[in-house]
């Protein structure tokens, strides 16, 4: 087996572990490595390629996640037999996929896989900590709703959502300053479905959606899946670059702006009131709508709230998305779109075309959960925990990160953005970090073109304060090994 690595930095270069994985995959698909063949030991292949053994381990992990190889402790890693259906021979027909499907596959394969990361501190994911879920309280509410609602709850409901949850959601948004009633709310399966519906509302195949760079990676996938292109708007310390925004929105092929002004993902910052007002003025001048993603808006644990764009908008420019996936638990899969005017009817038509009804029992239970004050009690506890976790990460960053690094100080949400010294590609750093016992999200996955980045996102969603300190210390050791003893800790905040 021959593997050739591109080691020179460049925008087109894949991370080293992915180069290894893709070349092994090619050997298997070409049947130069047969089913049952044993791959080289991790240590041996790392030595022959002159890479760290954790880089090879990450490559093998990616292949295992794809079902191409399987590892057995004490025996090694082996090529798996082609997958069969009901004992039949391997499929002779492989369908030709659409360009969109191929591109989505490429995007998914470019993302790190953490399936066998063992005891590493999970600072890569924004999935909430299950130990903080108010599961018992929600179960009591759900049981009560099912008992009182009976069989009708299990029928198809309206496309817009459960009537009581629509009223409750409108009241919840009004508390945040967004003037809306139940007629302007459409419930959806989390913010992800809301993003897809909002993109389809404004853009067709070949059109362009403007979005910050870096940005939420799933909006890039959603745009790709709809045959859309994206136009990056650079993020500055105080928010997106307004000059670039105006030039971009003035282009006729650009149909809308997607933005995360509150607890930005991945950066964690919150755009100021003045910056928001300027953004809305630009959108109004250019006649382009704004899709505001407020998925973490309920998670403020410090500082003074800033009005949502939808609260400042008086002309109907803004479509506002919200979700309970991060603030409550993701399994409920309930989000909401707030809109005005003809956009509401159009969104309902788009939703009905692919999704006849929602899970009425869960929506009814969530409405009761909010009305009973259970959600507010949960948020009060969650905010205290998140503040303590954020502070633990900030203290550890100041202690362990090298000179030249800087990071954000979020006032809510789950994420901190770290900018490392020049010359570091965090895609390659990840393999060393996994070996040292910490996971993070490399900045490249939030760039529109996936290019290399010296930045990374650290999450304090899943791990407790002690684990987070341990994870940052591990990251510091990895960076010290990369940069040499000359690196010294320095607290610099963005």
Predicted regions located by residue number:
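Conserved core segment of the aminotransferase class I/II
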Residues: 314-384
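Short beta-strand "wing" residues that participate in macromolecule-binding interfaces
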Residues: 70-71, 180, 440-441
């Amino acid at each position: 087996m021959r593997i050739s690595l591109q080691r020179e930095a460049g925008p087109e270069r894949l991370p080293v572990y992915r180069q290894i994985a893709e070349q092994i995959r090619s050997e298997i698909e070409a049947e130069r490595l047969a089913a049952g063949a044993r791959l080289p030991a991790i240590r041996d292949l790392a030595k022959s390629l002159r890479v760290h053994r954790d880089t090879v381990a990450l490559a093998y992990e990616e292949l295992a996640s794809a079902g191409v190889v399987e590892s057995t402790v004490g025996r090694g890693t082996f090529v798996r037999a082609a997958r069969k259906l009901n004992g039949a021979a391997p499929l002779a027909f492989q369908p030709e996929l659409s360009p969109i499907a191929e591109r989505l596959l490429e995007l998914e394969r470019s993302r790190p896989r953490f399936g066998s990361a063992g005891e590493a501190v999970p600072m890569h994911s924004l999935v909430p900590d299950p130990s903080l879920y108010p599961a018992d309280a929600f179960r009591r509410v759900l049981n009560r709703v099912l008992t009182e609602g009976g069989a009708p709850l299990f029928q198809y409901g309206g496309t817009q959502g459960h009537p009581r949850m629509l009223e409750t959601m409108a009241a919840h948004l009004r508390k945040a300053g967004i003037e809306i009633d139940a007629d302007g709310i459409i419930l959806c399966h989390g913010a992800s479905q809301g993003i897809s519906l909002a993109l389809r509302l404004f853009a067709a195949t070949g059109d362009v959606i403007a979005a910050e760079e870096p940005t939420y990676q799933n909006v890039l996938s959603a745009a790709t899946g709809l045959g859309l292109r994206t136009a990056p708007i650079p993020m500055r310390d105080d928010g997106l670059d307004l000059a670039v925004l105006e030039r971009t929105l003035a282009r006729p092929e650009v149909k809308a702006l997607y933005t995360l002004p509150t607890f930005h993902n991945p950066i964690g910052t919150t755009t100021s009131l003045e910056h928001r007002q300027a953004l809305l003025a630009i959108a109004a001048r250019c006649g382009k709508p704004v899709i505001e993603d407020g998925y973490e808006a309920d998670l403020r644990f410090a500082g003074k709230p800033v009005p949502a764009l939808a609260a400042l908008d008086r002309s109907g420019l803004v479509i506002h998305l919200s979700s309970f996936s991060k603030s409550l638990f993701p399994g409920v899969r309930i989000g909401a779109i707030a809109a005005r005017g003809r956009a509401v009817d159009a969104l309902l038509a788009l939703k009905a075309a692919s999704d006849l009804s929602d899970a009425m029992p869960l929506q009814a239970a969530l409405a009761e959960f909010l009305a009973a004050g259970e959600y507010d009690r949960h948020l009060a506890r969650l905010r205290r925990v998140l503040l303590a976790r954020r502070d633990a990460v900030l203290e550890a960053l100041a202690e362990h990160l090298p000179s030249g690094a800087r990071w954000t100080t979020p006032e809510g949400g789950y994420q901190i953005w770290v900018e490392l010294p020049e010359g570091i590609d965090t895609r390659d750093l990840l393999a060393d970090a996994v070996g040292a016992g910490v996971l993070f999200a490399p900045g490249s996955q939030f760039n529109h073109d996936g290019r290399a980045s010296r930045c990374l996102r650290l999450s304090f969603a899943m791990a407790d304060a002690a684990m987070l300190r341990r994870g940052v210390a591990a990251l510091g050791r990895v960076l010290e090994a990369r940069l040499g003893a000359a690196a010294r800790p320095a607290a610099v905040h963005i």
